[in-house]
Every structure is written in structure tokens, then in C-alpha cells.
UniProtKB/Swiss-Prot annotation:
Ranges of the Intravirion topological domain: 1-75
Naturally occurring in which organism (per UniProt): Varicella-zoster virus (strain Oka vaccine)
Major localisation: virion
Protein name from the UniProt record: Envelope protein US9
Role of this protein: Essential for the anterograde spread of the infection throughout the host nervous system. Together with the gE/gI heterodimer, US9 is involved in the sorting and transport of viral structural components toward axon tips.
Length: 102
């Protein structure tokens, strides 16, 4: 659980340190409003020279998704092991008591 909080903290810290580097535009032009048809500017991070915000978030999302499935697999495995252990214990207890009764 602590590792997940650390990773989320790092992801938030990297997002907070994002540096927006717009495409080169002439100095004499001013942008009054972003047109809806115009594609959004790409956002790059100071840590990486070629990783955009979308790529970064996709990478972090895949990592979080992988951890979620790994935990889910571990929980299901533990439940199955517990059920088999209890079933084995019940059969063993039945066998032992049958030795004394019968």
C-alpha cells in the first residue's frame, strides 16, 4: 500500500512540474483564443525531452492497472488456498474422529 502511495505521489509531483513548451511561433503574433478545431499544444515534461503528457499519463495508468490486477490475482489465490486448506482440515478432522468413534 505504501508503494502505491509513493508512485501516486511521484506521478502527481511530475504533473506539477510539467513545463508547457508550445510550438515555435513568431514573436509578433498574439493568440486571442484557442479555436476548437485547432489541435491542442503538446505538453512536455522537464524530466523528458520527448514524452508528452498523454504518453506519460498512459504509462502511469498502465502501471497502476498492472498493480491492480496483480493484487486481484493475489487475493483470489489466497482465497483458493484458504478454501482448499479448510476442506483438507475438515476431511482430516472427519477421518480422525471416525477412528475414535467407529
Amino acid at each position: 500500500m505504501a508503494g502505491q502511495n509513493t508512485m501516486e505521489g511521484e506521478a502527481v509531483a511530475l504533473l506539477m512540474e510539467a513545463v508547457v513548451t508550445p510550438r515555435a511561433q513568431p514573436n509578433n503574433t498574439t493568440i486571442t483564443a484557442i479555436q476548437p478545431s485547432r489541435s491542442a499544444e503538446k505538453c512536455y515534461y522537464s524530466d523528458s525531452e520527448n514524452e508528452t503528457a498523454d504518453e506519460f499519463l498512459r504509462r502511469i495508468g498502465k502501471y497502476q492497472h498492472k498493480i491492480y490486477h496483480r493484487k486481484k490475482f493475489c487475493y483470489i489465490t489466497l482465497i483458493i488456498v484458504f478454501v482448499f486448506a479448510m476442506t483438507g482440515a475438515a476431511f482430516a478432522l472427519g477421518y480422525i474422529t471416525s477412528q475414535f468413534v467407529g
